[in-house]
Amino acid sequence: MNSKWSRRQAMQSVAAAVALASAAEPMLRAQGGAAPHHTTKEDFVRLLTELSNWNRWGKDDQMGAVNLITPAKRKQALALVKEGASYSMARSAELQEAVDNPAPIVRKMTRVGSAAPGTGSGGTGDTFFISYHGYAHTHMDSLCHFLWDGKMYNGYSKEEVTENGAARNAILNFKNGIITRGVLMDMARHKGIDYLEPGTAIYPEDLDAWEKKAKVKVQAGDVMIIRTGRWARRDAKGPWPVAQGLAGLHVSCAKWFHARDIAILGGDGAQDVLPSGVEGVTQPVHLLSLVAMGTPIFDNLDLELIGREADKRKRWEFLVTASTAATPGGTGSVLNPIATF
């Protein structure tokens, strides 16, 4: 009886998986996606060389595309502020374990109010333990976070990252802050829906269509920000295993934003569509951005508020300011980027 029941369950699971796979391509068409761009692992490896910024800013460079945020670029971005209205693009700390958050932020109270005296001076305190890389917490990836064939951006060896942290391409290089123009490419609103379904790929044609509709061009030194509506979907349907399915950029978009000379890539997911569609390479957009181009990444932004505010104003460009933790040797940092209109 148990054996038959197990076989029946297995057959039902297979049938469900086949149905889901069969539905995937029509779903992409319904959401307005472009025709699939087939990319092999060999194509990806060629892109690592074709899109490389190694030595562009010198053999000792560790800033990568952030070099494109010049003093003139900062002044241009500051001039975008007309109202002084500012909005966070960070997800509030996720403290509860979930299928999309296996490493929640742990808060330990070291001093609580009830222990303080009733008169005179008192105080409270806490400690946070944060494993910020992954699919839940808003953070910035430094240029040492990903490697290919034992190398990170600008040819630095994997041996530069030890138990003592990263000696090259660490997050400390960005301690003076990010001040530049941000462009929100709201792909869900562009398609007239609340959110893109998991596994929906965004193609270069989609980026072109968004620019035409929004009448805004992504420029050199910008933070390019992609909203898929990932958190809106979570609010509507609950958490899901995002490593198995997440809307995002197809690897073919890498040429697009390399040509635009963006300084930083950001979005409400992992930037990559998951699955990536490139056999043997889980996150090709991450690899091309961090390793080849030296373009840091803002992962897991919460773009629901800024999406509504930008749509209300029909203004998709704004000042972006962000500051990392000044952590020597860090491979990244928690982050609270601010958009100001």
Functional labels for PLM-detected ranges:
Residues 2-18:
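N-terminal secretory signal peptides and thylakoid transit peptides that target proteins
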Residues 31-341:
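Active-/binding-site microenvironments in catalytic and ligand-binding cores
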Residues 19-24:
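Hydrophobic h-region of N-terminal signal peptides that target proteins for export
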